[in-house]
Amino acid sequence: VSFRDRTKKKTAENYFMTLNVFPDMLAVPDKYYLGSVNLDFIGMGNMIAYDSVAMVRDGFYDLTLEESSYATNQWSVSEEVTAFYAMANLEMEVAGREVTGNVGVRYLQTDQSSTAFARSGGDLVQQTVSHDYNNVLPSLNLRMALDEQQTIRFGIAKTMSRPRMDEMNASFSIGVSQVPDVYGNYIGAGGGNTTLEPKEALGIDLTYENYFADDGYFAIALYRKELKEWIFDGAAEIDVSNFLAATGQTTPDGSTTATVNGKVNGGDGTLTGYEVSLAMPLSLLHESLDGWGIFASHTGVSSDIKAPGGADFELPGLSKSIQQATVYYENGGFEARLSVRKRDDFKGDLYGLGFSVEQYEMLGETIADAQISYDFSGSGIEYLEGLRVYLQGVNLTDEPFTSLNGGVVRDYQEYGENYRLGFSYDF
């Protein structure tokens, strides 16, 4: 049995900045001037760069707090989760071969609530909304040894992934219309959804492993996940009678149901994929290659998931293809390795204005890292026993991070190469 209680709060104070000599203009003083920044990647050329934070701090701007219009950006979300676990080990014989594994089940009871503001024009009403649900998550894992070096593994499990806490906040903006919407409601709103529940998946995994040497193995894994209750942008209906009573607003027919545009559970689909991996000491090929080795893997993934309206949907963070390769050399405490990872384009989340989270297309990348190190444990130098020194190089090809919105560059960042020199000592 376990219990977890977590709370997330967002406090957003937004100010409108007005230059203190407005409507006159002011040249940027030299002490704040930082040069220029190149914006060629979005077709804007060079742009002035200056220390705007310092200018605010030194009183060049008058700040006006925008309380009402940004009140819905402030909220708190709490979540209490009680979990019960049970597991039993399995040991049996199938077709003359030993099969081991375990079977288990997890029951979770979740109580969540959110306190936030509802807004309509200049009217603000603080509200607390609660929601509770439960989940039952069974699992089965089996392992069959074909011989001393070959193994087959099988797993099936129901899993879940909780919504982001900011998606469950109780804040929204309300508008009352004289004409009903497609749902027959006169009230429209936009904001969070306090009734969001976890995304669910039923996953099946099958893996073949071949340990052909002490430090070598080959493996191929196949997997399939049935996805349900995925979270999309959509519409839900909620009762806003408390808000209407507090503000004195009414609808033409006296109804109190609002159509809220935000995140909703709905739609389902499948995720299928495979992974092939190989680890091999090259001394298996020739004794002159003693100490050399490789590790390589390739992952391929495809998904078929539909939004509630039937449109195709791309899962965030999912690249259709990922390759990774490492070459290493180890000998007498010395170790060197070079790794390269390549992934295709994928969808991802970035913070937008007001710290809202928005989804964009992230371009694929190829990143190379390297490391050399020496462990003095086997050096024969007594006072250096336990010392290990290393030099790391990260992003050696200076791969940029690029995101697109509608085919136009949204964000472009160059991190440059990163080198680290360090040591560790075991007493």
Task: List each language-model region with its residue ranges.
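Gram-negative outer-membrane beta-barrel transporters
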Residues: 222-227, 236, 243-351
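Extracellular loop and loop/strand-boundary signature of outer-membrane beta-barrel proteins
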Residues: 69-75, 122-129, 190-194, 259-265, ...
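Outer-membrane beta-barrel signature, preferentially recognizing the C-terminal barrel domain
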Residues: 73-77, 160-227, 247-274, 279-282, ...
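Short loop/turn motifs that connect adjacent beta-strands in outer-membrane beta-barrel proteins
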Residues: 1, 10-12, 93-100, 147-149, ...
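Surface-exposed extracellular loop regions of Gram-negative outer-membrane beta-barrel proteins
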Residues: 1, 81-145, 201, 280-282, ...
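Conserved C-terminal beta-signal and adjacent last beta-strands/turns
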Residues: 140, 154, 202, 283, ...
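Transmembrane beta-strands of outer-membrane beta-barrel pores
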Residues: 3-9, 105-113, 156-162, 169-171, ...
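Flexible glycine-rich, low-complexity coil/linker segments exposed to the extracellular/periplasmic environment
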Residues: 9-73, 182-191, 237-264, 339
